[in-house]
Structure formats: structure tokens, C-alpha cells
């Protein structure tokens, strides 16, 4: 049995989120939530919400026992960038790209 949760368009870069995703890949659910709770990174809070959503999907849709679940796969894909401009000297402007990503978590036995 596999249960999936996806967060599309998370307002954080994929590179920063992958650092957190690599820490919990393959861990049991309880241990993964502990790692995410005590991590100081911004991405940890976002990934934790996606994992909790996947747990809720497992309970509600599949009737699964959450004690047996573990993080089967987690991957982070780059999404579209929000393009912004900032003012510079002499009437010029520089482009700023605000990165977004898609976070996909799959839980299984």
C-alpha cells in the first residue's frame, strides 16, 4: 500500500528543500517527524506539513495503521520562478527570481 501527498508551488528553493528531504528518506514515520520537528531549517516545517498530510491520507482513505508506515520516497522538483525586479542606480533594474518547488512524499510499508 502506498499513500501520496503533493505540495505544489512551495515558496522555497528546491536545492534547500532537498537537504531536508534527504534526511528523512527511508525513515519510519515517528522518527521522520522527530527529525523535522527539531530541524532549524525553514524547509523542515514545509516538508513536515506534507508528511502529516500523507499520514492523514493514509488514515482516512486507506485505513492504514500509521505505526507501520515509513517514508518510502520523497523527492523535490523545481517549479516555476516568480520574476521580480529591484531598482538599481541610474534608472536600471536587476531581475530577482524567487524560486518555487514541488514536494512529493510517498508513504508505504
Curated annotation (Swiss-Prot):
InterPro entries to which the protein is assigned, alphabetical: Ribosomal_uL22, Ribosomal_uL22_bac/chlpt-type, Ribosomal_uL22_bac/org-type, Ribosomal_uL22_CS, Ribosomal_uL22_sf
Keywords in alphabetical order: Ribonucleoprotein, Ribosomal protein, RNA-binding, rRNA-binding
GO biological process: translation
Transmembrane helix keyword on record: no
GO molecular function, one term: rRNA binding
A GO cellular-component term linked to this record: cytosolic large ribosomal subunit
Keyword Transport among UniProt keywords: no
PANTHER family: CHLOROPLAST 50S RIBOSOMAL PROTEIN L22-RELATED, LARGE RIBOSOMAL SUBUNIT PROTEIN UL22M
Function (record text): This protein binds specifically to 23S rRNA; its binding is stimulated by other ribosomal proteins, e.g. L4, L17, and L20. It is important during the early stages of 50S assembly. It makes multiple contacts with different domains of the 23S rRNA in the assembled 50S subunit and ribosome.
HAMAP family membership: Ribosomal_uL22_B
Family as reported in the entry's similarity comment: Belongs to the universal ribosomal protein uL22 family.
Subunit-level organization: Part of the 50S ribosomal subunit.
Name listed for the protein in its UniProt record: Large ribosomal subunit protein uL22
Organism: Cupriavidus taiwanensis (strain DSM 17343 / BCRC 17206 / CCUG 44338 / CIP 107171 / LMG 19424 / R1)
Amino acid at each position: 500500500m502506498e499513500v501520496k501527498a503533493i505540495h505544489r508551488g512551495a515558496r522555497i528553493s528546491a536545492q534547500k528543500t532537498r537537504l531536508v528531504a534527504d534526511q528523512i528518506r527511508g525513515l519510519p514515520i515517528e522518527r521522520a517527524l522527530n527529525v523535522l520537528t527539531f530541524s532549524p531549517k525553514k524547509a523542515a516545517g514545509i516538508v513536515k506539513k506534507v508528511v502529516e498530510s500523507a499520514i492523514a491520507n493514509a488514515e482516512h482513505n486507506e485505513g492504514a495503521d500509521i505505526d507501520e508506515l515509513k517514508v518510502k520516497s520523497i523527492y523535490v522538483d523545481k517549479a516555476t520562478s516568480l520574476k521580480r525586479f529591484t531598482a538599481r542606480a541610474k534608472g536600471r533594474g536587476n531581475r530577482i527570481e524567487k524560486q518555487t518547488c514541488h514536494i512529493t512524499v510517498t508513504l508505504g510499508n
